[in-house]
Structure formats: C-alpha cells, structure tokens
C-alpha cells in the first residue's frame, strides 16, 4: 500500500486548511498551519488563479487526505455512493465517516485517524466482541467498538480520551468512557460533518 512519507503539516498548508492529521498537536500553538497558513515551497505565498478542474481536484485531494484514503479506494467509494439511493455526495461522506478507523477517532479512542489505523492493525479494538484488524471496515447501526480491558492501559488510548472534549463526539456515536466502549447509534448525517467540505465539487469531478 502506498504511503505518504513527507511532513503531514505540509499537506494542511498545501490544501489551505487544517486537516487535523497530527492529533493533539493541531490544537496547540505548535501547529505549522497556524504559523504559516500558506502553501509550502519558494512560491507558496503567491496565490494562483485556479481553473474549475483544479478547484474540484483540490477538494477531492483534501477529503482523501483527511480520511487517509488512496485514490483507488476513494473512487470505489464514489461508485458505491453513486449507485446507492440518495444524494451521491452525501452518500460518499457517509461511507468515509463509517470507516472503522474514522469511528475510533471520532469516539476519542485515538488522537488521529493515522493513529487509529495503527491501533486497529495491531488488534487493539474489538468490533461486536470480535478482534478486528481492518481499518476500512464499514460500521453499521448497533455495532459496538470496544477496547478490551488488557489494552486499556496503553498510553496512546488513555491519552486520546483526554482531548476528545476539544472536538466532541458526534451525535450518531455514543461513548462510555468508563468501559472504553462506543456504540453506533445511527448513520451519520450531512450535518454531523462539521469539517468544511464541498462534496458537490467531487461529484462534478468524477462525473466528467
């Protein structure tokens, strides 16, 4: 699987917005985007006029990077979203939100989606009582995500819960912090996604 090895803060500066890729650091004055809110490189401060295609492409890249999804899988999500009932763009965001790694992050059981993927691959969580190691699994209403007791002392899990209040737990999820257990109460709705995303641009890009 392809992997981005450059500084993650450069991605935020490239997209012109915080992508919250580094967990707790993004909420501090150490955030590189807060200190240098312009694109990286020698000509980063120069604003270039963008074509409609470039605007659509940047929006797609931004969303891909937020959720940590490669192009092939992102396009597959779009195909499924386009075939499903409802609005294609909203369906696409729902598929991304229902990824297990995103749910673990949203519950506050990991500092970032990157960390959530690492923890899942190491078998730290259970899904409906069964050990799971696939970050891209889609959760459904009624599913429960839990940290078994033997894994609750892992520092990154315990530390993550201390900052969940800063970003909040979405209404479609419920967390019992005392038992490290989260439940999917409902499917995510468009209004549950507070991050600035214009999904219509992505639909236009893939519809060409």
UniProtKB/Swiss-Prot annotation:
Domain S4 RNA-binding, chain residue ranges per copy: 98-158
Taxonomic source organism: Lawsonia intracellularis (strain PHE/MN1-00)
Quaternary structure and interacting proteins, as annotated: Part of the 30S ribosomal subunit. Contacts protein S5. The interaction surface between S4 and S5 is involved in control of translational fidelity.
Keywords for this protein: Ribonucleoprotein, Ribosomal protein, RNA-binding, rRNA-binding
Listed name of the protein: Small ribosomal subunit protein uS4
GO cellular component: small ribosomal subunit
GO molecular-function terms, A-Z: rRNA binding; structural constituent of ribosome
Function: One of the primary rRNA binding proteins, it binds directly to 16S rRNA where it nucleates assembly of the body of the 30S subunit. With S5 and S12 plays an important role in translational accuracy.
GO biological process, one term: translation
NCBIfam families documented for this protein: PRK05327.1, rpsD_bact
Family, per entry: Belongs to the universal ribosomal protein uS4 family.
InterPro entries found in the cross-reference section: Ribosomal_uS4, Ribosomal_uS4_bac-type, Ribosomal_uS4_CS, Ribosomal_uS4_N, S4_RNA-bd, S4_RNA-bd_sf
Disulfide-linked positions: none
Gene from which the chain derives: rpsD
């Amino acid at each position: 699987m392809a992997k981005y090895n450059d500084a993650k803060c450069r991605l935020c500066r490239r997209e012109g917005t915080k992508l919250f890729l580094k967990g707790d650091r993004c909420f501090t004055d150490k955030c590189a985007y807060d200190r240098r809110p312009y694109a990286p490189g020698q000509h980063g401060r120069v604003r270039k006029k963008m074509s409609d295609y470039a605007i659509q492409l940047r929006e797609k890249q931004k969303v891909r990077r937020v959720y940590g999804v490669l192009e092939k899988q992102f396009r597959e999500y779009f195909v499924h979203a386009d075939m499903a009932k409802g609005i294609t763009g909203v369906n696409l965001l729902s598929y991304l939100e229902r990824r297990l790694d995103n749910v673990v992050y949203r519950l506050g059981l990991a500092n970032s989606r990157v960390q959530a993927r690492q923890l899942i691959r190491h078998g730290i969580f259970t899904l409906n009582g069964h050990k799971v190691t696939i970050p891209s699994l889609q959760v459904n209403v009624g599913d429960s995500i839990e940290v078994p007791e033997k894994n609750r002392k892992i520092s990154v899990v315990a530390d993550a819960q201390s900052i969940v209040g800063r970003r909040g737990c979405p209404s479609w999820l419920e967390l019992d912090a005392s038992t490290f257990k989260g439940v999917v109460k409902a499917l995510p709705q468009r209004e549950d996604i507070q991050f600035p995303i214009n999904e219509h641009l992505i639909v236009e890009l893939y519809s060409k």
